Amino acid sequence: MILKLKDGEVKIKLFSDIAPNHVKRFKTLADSNQYDGVVFHRVIDGFMAQTGDVEFGNSTNDKYDLARAGTGGSDLPDLKAEFSNLAHEKGVVSMARSSDPNSANSQFFICFVDAPHLDRNYTAFGKVIEGMEFVDKIKRGDSQSGSVSSPDKIISLRSVQ
């Protein structure tokens, strides 16, 4: 996958052998342009950058509402957890969810650092293999909540052909 950010392109390797349903969802949403223009609504320095709210977080959509970004998802059903032994280390891409382990839908995050407390609690399904320096430049939010007032956004996200 190629994730275009304001500072450059990020190449993400997906692990369909570990989390086939999450990889399929990620590719489906990306290749139908649903992630384009979606903001990084929660970015915590020393932890991760969260994005992927295609409902309220898409800055090009009529439903865009930064205050509600992070509460929405796609019109597809939630996914069942696909926990694995893939460690949440720097550059790992994982699906965000509510307190229900089977509630992942469209939101995802990229780890800035190792986050072992997430291991086997969130579905990791990919890893940044090039361009992590551009992920590291994503605008950070409030130190407590991670809320970003004028957030960076995904320019585009597509499968590599």
Q: What is the predicted function of each stretch?
A:
Residues M1-Q161:
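Cyclophilin-like peptidyl-prolyl cis-trans isomerases
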